[in-house]
From Swiss-Prot:
Residues 1-245, 387-406 are annotated as: Disordered. Interacts with MARK1, MARK2, MARK3 and MARK4. Interacts with SQSTM1 when polyubiquitinated. Interacts with PSMC2 through SQSTM1. Interacts with FKBP4. Binds to CSNK1D. Interacts with SGK1. Interacts with PIN1. Interacts with LRRK2. Interacts with LRP1, leading to endocytosis; this interaction is reduced in the presence of LRPAP1/RAP. The lineage of its organism: Eukaryota, Metazoa, Chordata, Craniata, Vertebrata. Promotes microtubule assembly and stability, and might be involved in the establishment and maintenance of neuronal polarity. The C-terminus binds axonal microtubules while the N-terminus binds neural plasma membrane components, suggesting that tau functions as a linker protein between both. Axonal polarity is predetermined by tau localization (in the neuronal cell) in the domain of the cell body defined by the centrosome. The short isoforms allow plasticity of the cytoskeleton whereas the longer isoforms may preferentially play a role in its stabilization. InterPro entries: MAP2/MAP4/Tau (IPR027324), MAP_tubulin-bd_rpt (IPR001084), Tau (IPR002955). Its main location: cytoplasm. It comes from Spermophilus citellus. This is Microtubule-associated protein tau. One of its GO terms (biological process) is hibernation.
Amino acid sequence: MAEPRQEFDTAEDHAEGYALLQDQEGEHGLKASPLQTPADDGPEEPVSETSDAKSTPTAEDVTAPLVDERTPGEQAATQPPTDIPEGTTAEEAGIGDTPNMEDQAAGHVTQARMVSKGKEGTGSEDRKAKGADSKTGTKIATPRGTAPPGQKGTANATRIPAKTTPSPKTPPGTGEPAKSGDRSGYSSPGSPGTPGSRSRTPSLPTPPTREPKKVAVVRTPPKSPSSTKSRLQTAPVPMPDLKNVRSKIGSTENLKHQPGGGKVQIINKKLDLSNVQSKCGSKDNIKHVPGGGSVQIVYKPVDLSKVTSKCGSLGNIHHKPGGGQVEVKSEKLDFKDRVQSKIGSLDNITHVPGGGNKKIETHKLTFRENAKAKTDHGAEIVYKSPVVSGDTSPRHLSNVSSTGSINMVDSPQLATLADEVSASLAKQGL
């Protein structure tokens, strides 16, 4: 469980290192020139020495897998800067035992962590900035004489167990080619070709007056394995070296084994039924034709000339039954001549019953003349016909009669009032 976590940390350190390298190149204007590391002086000397000790190969590093016997100066002089494509091992590229950029970065990361754990009081901002620069950017080897012997021993002491720790998953014989192939997969995600060429160019000595610009390193929190897996999948991963890989349980011993079966051929042959015998001898009567089925239905007319009746009914064949010859005649009846009354009622046919000679007389009712008011108001109502002769005028007539009654002709309002009263009384039946 410790190895996958260490590989994820190195991949993150690679990404941060290339980001810082691009920032330094943009600030110092060194995009077209090879990578240069500023000189370390002042209070930053222990950190620079530690970084030099980390990157300087010594005699004790011969036991480490990826260490060259020559000095880095000789390596830079003898070998020109070449671009090595990703996914190739050191033996295929023809470099020999020269450590590549990814192995140096991985070694720097592990050494820096172990040194920081072993030492106390190394938590200042300058040490963090310088540790980040040595971890990510300074991958160029320096001569052996630059580092003090005391620090060289500590760097080698910390580097040997980090480099020679055997992996429990890979055999010891095939650890270094597999590691170089795996480390080559953790190249820069942006430009995979340029960091290799920069790491193999010799560093030029920088003037001591120029001080490196301190860059604050922001440590990102550790990412989850799912995010790192998604980020690692986007980078071009070379094909792993499967020649020296051994399975855990020996499942590759029968790798070329081909399982049996699968060679069954289904052949369709016609069945030979010539010699087949029936189970119960049913072929003995195979040509038997069952009887029946040959009945012909013939339609012939029935001869009824010689047919005799059952009970001698032909003797009365011409017999006509009686009845049915009744004729309904319509004759006009003469009642006057032939009809007589039952009880002699025609004797009194001219009799006129008594009564019925009364006359209904129609008399005109003189109700208005005889009408009187219910309440006696002391005046007599005299009614006269409204027809008045032309020679007489209303003024000529007296308004009051001799008896003192009011004349209805002179006052039309009283006349209308009397008419209304008489009409209402007539309706009431008085």
